[in-house]
């Protein structure tokens, strides 16, 4: 299992595997991740079998899947990077810029953990 999908399932009403498959379906339909760049182009930069591989429970999710989750569920996701000495946070917003819920996760450099959620 992937810690990202497990962390998202903590806040969403879906199992981690359901979230993974919903996100992969979204990517497979070539729906936009970010404004101005086709999703198939973004995925081709990584691996031509990206979605097929991501459907496997052993694959780790990352920024692409976080952005897809934002778009699917109108979420703002804040990832607190707590790896290393320099702490930072990365904010992901849905392509519509309208979100109803904020989810916060921590990233340790190789692991996501759920932190908290709140209304927009």
Residue ranges of each PLM-predicted region?
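Active-site nucleophile-adjacent alpha helix/oxyanion-hole segment immediately C-terminal to the catalytic cysteine
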Residues: 1-38, 73
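Acidic, glycine-rich loop-and-strand cores that form catalytic or ligand-binding grooves
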Residues: 29-56, 71-75, 79
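Deubiquitinase catalytic domains
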Residues: 55-120
């Amino acid at each position: 299992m992937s810690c990202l999908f497990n962390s998202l399932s903590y806040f969403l009403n879906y199992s981690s595997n359901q979230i993974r498959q919903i996100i992969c379906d979204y990517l497979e339909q070539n729906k936009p991740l970010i404004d101005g760049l086709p999703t198939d182009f973004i995925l081709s930069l990584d691996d031509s079998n990206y979605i097929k591989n991501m459907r496997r429970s052993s694959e780790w999710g990352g920024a692409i899947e976080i952005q897809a989750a934002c778009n699917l569920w109108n979420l703002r996701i804040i990832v607190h990077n707590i790896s290393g000495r320099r702490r930072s946070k990365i904010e992901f917003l849905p392509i519509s810029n309208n979100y109803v819920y904020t989810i916060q996760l921590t990233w340790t450099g190789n692991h996501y953990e759920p932190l908290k959620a709140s209304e927009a």
